[in-house]
Amino acid sequence: MRSKHLVTLFIITFLSFSTVKVWGKDVFAGFVTKKLKTLLDCNFALYYNFKGNGPDAGSFLDFVDEPEQFYWFVEHFLSVKFRVPKHLKDKNIHNFTPCLNRSWVSEFLKEYEEPFVNPVMKFLDKEQRLFFTYNFGDVEPQGKYTYFPVKEFHKYCILPPLIKTNIKDGESGEFLKYQLNKEEYKVFLSSVGSQMTAIKNLYSTVEDEQRKQLLKVIIENESTNDISVQCPTYNIKLHYTKECANSNNILKCIDEFLRKTCEKKTESKHPSADLCEHLQFLFESLKNPYLDNFKKFMTNSDFTLIKPQSVWNVPIFDIYKPKNYLDSVQNLDTECFKKLNSKNLIFLSFHDDIPNNPYYNVELQEIVKLSTYTYSIFDKLYNFFFVFKKSGAPISPVSVKELSHNITDFSFKEDNSEIQCQNVRKSLDLEVDVETMKGIAAEKLCKIIEKFILTKDDASKPEKSDIHRGFRILCILISTHVEAYNIVRQLLNMESMISLTRYTSLYIHKFFKSVTLLKGNFLYKNNKAIRYSRACSKASLHVPSVLYRRNIYIPETFLSLYLGLSNLVSSNPSSPFFEYAIIEFLVTYYNKGSEKFVLYFISIISVLYINEYYYEQLSCFYPKEFELIKSRMIHPNIVDRILKGIDNLMKSTRYDKMRTMYLDFESSDIFSREKVFTALYNFDSFIKTNEQLKKKNLEEISEIPVQLETSNDGIGYRKQDVLYETDKPQTMDEASYEETVDEDAHHVNEKQHSAHFLDAIAEKDILEEKTKDQDLEIELYKYMGPLKEQSKSTSAASTSDEISGSEGPSTESTSTGNQGEDKTTDNTYKEMEELEEAEGTSNLKKGLEFYKSSLKLDQLDKEKPKKKKSKRKKKRDSSSDRILLEESKTFTSENEL
């Protein structure tokens, strides 16, 4: 019996010890099974022998100090299915058979859901160094370099030049060329006159007869042949991330590297240390003032040497793929990881300063999740569900019992108190048209993206996202602001009715989705900029989902800043259950584990803030307009109660997991009224600048329709909901041409170059011009009044009834009018009827340039038969809440009994 206990104790001790050993120093050792270790060795063997000439020590990748090299190896080797290239199949390099058709990243993520990347880097770096030591012994591994090609100091070659000709050698048949050595180059530099004069001067000093004879042939054929002096390229080699981590500018980084290297040139083993010798030789040959300037450069960090020779383009660097190293034409050095783009030239000069341009800023690799590199859609889906499965049980729906215990006040929210205007800052300008606001909103978001991608502070980046905290909030908040602005101007009859279906958020969505159109706005083709623009594109699509009730086109939701939200969550802001209704709506997306939970959450909170913002601005600074649309907004005090209630619910034990998930991706600033309103005020200030108000032309957007992820989320398209325009959209060439037009001329003709509405339907689906215009005019009657035919009149009247009955709680009719307006309306109908009889051409122009009908929303009530007001209309949206209220009261009374 005692022996059994001893055996048991020994086994437990052994297992505990082995566990500590596995998990103590190396987090991933427990997951890197023998199969994964074998697969990793296969990838290392394939990579180091990729050229087929045996293992190459210059192929070492520095995974820790150069994260970009780590991601390169993951992308091209570890994340793809393992295959042996044709040129290596016949060579006995390694036993690759157990590794075929396997992906290391996919198998690793099945063992570990989503690891922190830094420990993975260190683990793979350790494994690579073991492989390197096994194959190369005591050779010290050096990570690959970033190459910066440079040729000239001013007009002088840094290296001794090469004389090239088109004179053919009689024996070899090749063109004659002459490579100068250092002594010859010194003579060449001391010569006065043209290049041929310098060559002739050089000829008189050369002692080697064979080289002298070659120069003689070149000089004798001067008049009949092409002779040029070309500077060889010197590649400055840097460990880019390591060397430039403390500098915010690429050119200054190279300057600093040269100072450090040239100060200790005698002891430096760096491959670019000999550049100091070449420069010293050149400056001594040229003498003053260059030698003195070089000494100043060595001691003064404000003195610069590396300068851009051309305007830089993107991408700034050329990063090579494995196949590029096999290309005999490119003839790449194995130790070269990436190289400055051939269009981005640099040279050496002591004149002028480094230009202030964001392209010269250091572009360091961001930390990206490993799951980004999963090989196939199947892998991505597997990892998604695997992570979700490990995240815990979903949140169950709230019960009536819980509601009765958690809600202490079952009365409906009411507040008619006046706003304290002394505490409200005037910010809103109602005179700017919606089309202009769209363009300015996109421009402002471009500026925000510039700010985020040019900052080096990664502290604000969440662990589970590569987008700065707060960016999605700003994107959605600005989209909501402009979307609500459109509704307000509609309610005040200040906007063309055609803008009803031109969702501002869809313009922003397509603007940022079409990243090829961002040239000239900010860092074009910059990977970070594209990532941020796509995030904003996706986020902004959720704004109309909240304001206009998902993907269902309901005209009545345009008549309120909160009715779409009420319909979305099936509750009313005045209801005591409204906060729970919002949370329960979000729970459905949280349980799916999707990003939509975060985006819907921000959009809903933004809509609530926007109600408060417009209520305050209109109440304090536009009193007449405020009285017209007071009932279409939520009172700020009610908004504050709702926001506080949502915040408290998110902090509760039941919904705490939702808050944690949100904070993994985004900032808690969404609950700070001060920060939200500061963002709104900043955008309003941006609008008011004269420079921005001139930019009334919206960007030309491609005709690619918006692809929604599901049929229930976002805004869907139906042909009958889209208002077409007569004028065909410009081509991309025309759009780019307009960008070059003089700004004054652009301002004069701004109405002639109004914005193009992004077409939601593909071109192949669009009908002929005549049919299209007639469909448009018929569709407009839904919102503008009856047609000649009785059937159309009935349809329009019913639509008007629906619009007038959708005002929400405590809504009173604001329609006013006189006989003159009725006559105007009748004339409008006649004009529209004449349009139908025209030769298929419509007078509906782009943007706000011209619109025949100026029918006002308050005129819709005049066209419908008068009906008795329903007493139930006031609380129409809260019927479900009433039922729930009765159930909870019943439950409470039963408990009391």
From Swiss-Prot:
Disruption phenotype: Conditional knockdown results in the loss of rhoptry localization of both CLAG3.1 and RhopH2 in mature schizonts. Decreased long-term parasite viability. Decreased merozoite invasion capacity. Developmental block at trophozoite stage in cycle 2. Resistance of infected erythrocytes to sorbitol lysis and decreased uptake of 5-aminolevulinic acid by infected erythrocytes, indicating defects in the formation of new permeability pathways. No significant effects on parasite egress from the host erythrocyte. No significant effects on protein export from the intracellular parasite. Disulfide bonds join C157-C231, C244-C253, C262-C276, C421-C620, C475-C536. Proteolytically cleaved near C-terminus. One of its GO terms (cellular component) is host cell plasma membrane. Keywords: Cytoplasm, Cytoplasmic vesicle, Disulfide bond, Host cell membrane, Host membrane, Membrane, Phosphoprotein, Signal, Transmembrane, Transmembrane helix, Transport. Residues 788-845, 859-897 are annotated as: Disordered. It is found in: Host cell membrane; Parasitophorous vacuole membrane; Cytoplasm; Cytoplasmic vesicle, Secretory vesicle, Rhoptry. Residues 1-24 form the signal peptide. The modification Phosphoserine is found at S804. It is a single-pass membrane protein; Peripheral membrane protein. Participates in the formation of new permeability pathways in Plasmodium-infected erythrocytes enabling the uptake of nutrients from the blood plasma. Required for maintaining invasion capacity of merozoites. Required for the trophozoite to schizont developmental transition of the intracellular parasite. This is High molecular weight rhoptry protein 3.
